Amino acid sequence: MINGPQVSFITICYNGFKDTCELIESLQNKIHSVSYEIIVVDNASREDEAVKIQALYPSVTTIHSDENKGFSGGNNLGMKAARGQYLFLINNDTYIESDGIAYLIERLESHPEIGAASPKIRFA
């Protein structure tokens, strides 16, 4: 029995407030097939973007880092806070076009030899 969301979407924000808001909105508008949480790690932006994001999106978990820990370090902070069964690391300048998450989960669950899955990514 899962006591948390199926998926934790984790993204890093470093002076990318607009991009991060667009990502959050695309997740909220497109992902309906699974339960999920969104975690935004503010990687020491000039302005405290975690506070602004939390005010606009109260359901989003925000983490403020006093120092820029880079991509790996920022994601590690997000993963420590994650409650999901699956972790989905996603760049904040990504836009979700469709809900294919359930397909990825189905593949992972039906093939235990698979350790990771990723959707097709197109560059704009």
Question: How should each PLM-predicted stretch be described?
Answer:
Residues 6-8, 37:
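Cell-envelope/extracellular polymer assembly enzymes that use nucleotide-activated donors
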Residues 25-35:
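Short, acidic, metal-binding catalytic loop of nucleotide-sugar glycosyltransferases
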Residues 26, 42-51, 67:
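A conserved acidic beta->alpha catalytic loop
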Residues 35-44, 63-65:
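Short beta-strand/loop segment that forms part of the nucleotide-sugar
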Residues 64-82, 103:
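Glycine-rich, basic loop-to-helix element that forms the pyrophosphate-binding segment
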Residues 87:
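Short aromatic/hydrophobic "clamp" motif used to bind/position activated sugar donors
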Residues 91-95:
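The conserved acidic donor/metal-binding loop of glycosyltransferases
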Residues 98-124:
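Conserved donor NDP-sugar-binding/catalytic core segment of glycosyltransferases
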